[in-house]
Amino acid sequence: MLEYAGANIDLLAISDRGEVIKYPARRHALGYRYLDEPLQAERHYIPIDGKCFLLATDGIVSQIGGTSRRVMGSRHFQALLAEAKTADPRKLANSLMRGLRVWQGGEERRDDVMILAFRPPPPSR
């Protein structure tokens, strides 16, 4: 079982069949002194079942590019995930980075980009 609680970065789970499940993070910033209340993050308990898990910063979806020179957006990012058709973490991250480079074209990178893809080992019995 994987326990996840996030702030501003959703966790995505990708099955061996390529199905994507989103576990939403709280829309809450971390580490700012002016925040009075501590984060009350919702916890998700997720069966591992051979899934690949993915965390990605918003620098991907906010990247300008494409023929229309618009932000990539979450719909296009979801399409890249569907095109990848893999639950192998390395292949998935490489596929997403290729898709980002194609989308970006000659545009400048607007923000930092981080993709973390991992597959936990099956639980020992």
Question: Language-model features: where?
Answer:
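Conserved subregion of the PPM/PP2C metallophosphatase catalytic domain
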Residues: 1-125
